């Protein structure tokens, strides 16, 4: 039995690591589309095609439930997938919902009208495609009113992390935070809207300064998955744990080992 985790590259390993710690008895199959990363500058149709292909690999491996641990895929492809592609008996979940639950302190099953929440000014850091989709703002509007969201497209950060150039990644983060703070000097909360960003979370926190509540996805997604599986234990599929990639396994293994600080063996898929 296994739950699938899909990402455009290595960022989803932050989610996998959090899920492994929170739910050690849940086997996981990870699928990284490293051959086509990053998704953050691609067109929506391209992202949809790549995401469905990646998720299909996980379905073929016996997963009934797949987490899109990629905000760009969640923003650009998830709704379309859920409306017309996901087979009966399968589920694909995104990573926005746990964030919004935490930010608004409202459970997703709470279908009462949107209401005012304590947080009024929110900084959103995400890929260019996620920002342009306005998916986060759209989902937030179902739950809260009176929240000003200032979004910063963080071009180059994912590329630098995937290339292992953390010095460049950290410099880009500081630049993007400075750019946002010129438009919103004192955000109450900051959303790290990409699963790569926890790898540079300390840089975001330092650049934002004290007093800003930073919401990072891995632990929120892990907790949400735990709650979901308590309600739907039948969604644990029949697959065996594995790490899959569309890229070069040896290259991906080397970078993934640095991220997780443990040896991982990847298997190539077409």
UniProtKB/Swiss-Prot annotation:
Catalytic activity: L-glutamate = D-glutamate
Metal-binding keyword on record: no
Entry binding sites for substrate: 7-8, 39-40, 71-72, 195-196
EC number: 5.1.1.3
Pfam families given in the database record: Asp_Glu_race
Pathway: Cell wall biogenesis; peptidoglycan biosynthesis
Function: Provides the (R)-glutamate required for cell wall biosynthesis.
Name recorded for this polypeptide: Glutamate racemase
Source organism (scientific name): Jannaschia sp. (strain CCS1)
Gene: murI
């Amino acid at each position: 039995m296994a739950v699938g985790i899909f990402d455009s590259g290595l960022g989803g390993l932050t989610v996998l690591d959090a899920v492994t710690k929170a739910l050690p008895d849940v086997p996981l199959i990870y699928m990284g589309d490293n051959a086509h990363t990053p998704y953050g500058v691609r067109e929506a149709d391209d992202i949809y095609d790549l995401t469905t292909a990646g998720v299909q690999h996980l379905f073929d491996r016996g997963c009934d439930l797949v987490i899109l641990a990629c905000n760009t895929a969640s923003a650009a492809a998830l709704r379309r997938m859920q409306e017309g592609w996901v087979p009966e008996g399968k589920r694909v979940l995104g990573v926005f919902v746990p964030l919004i639950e935490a930010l608004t302190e409202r459970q997703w099953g709470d279908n009462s009208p949107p209401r005012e929440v304590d947080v009024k000014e929110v900084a959103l850091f995400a890929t260019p495609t996620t920002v342009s989709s306005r998916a986060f703002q759209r989902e937030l509007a179902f739950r809260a009113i009176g929240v000003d969201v200032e979004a910063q497209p963080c071009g180059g950060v994912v590329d630098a992390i995937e290339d292992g150039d953390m010095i460049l990644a950290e410099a880009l983060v500081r630049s993007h935070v400075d750019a946002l703070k010129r438009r919103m000097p004192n955000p109450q909360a900051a959303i790290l809207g990409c699963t790569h960003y926890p790898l540079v979370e300390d840089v975001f926190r330092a650049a934002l300064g004290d007093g800003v509540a930073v919401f990072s996805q891995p632990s929120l997604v892990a907790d949400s998955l735990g709650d979901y599986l308590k309600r739907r234990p039948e969604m644990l599929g029949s697959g065996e744990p594995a790490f899959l990639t569309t890229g070069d396994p040896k290259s991906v293994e080397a970078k993934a080992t640095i991220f997780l600080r443990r040896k991982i063996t990847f298997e190539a898929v077409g």
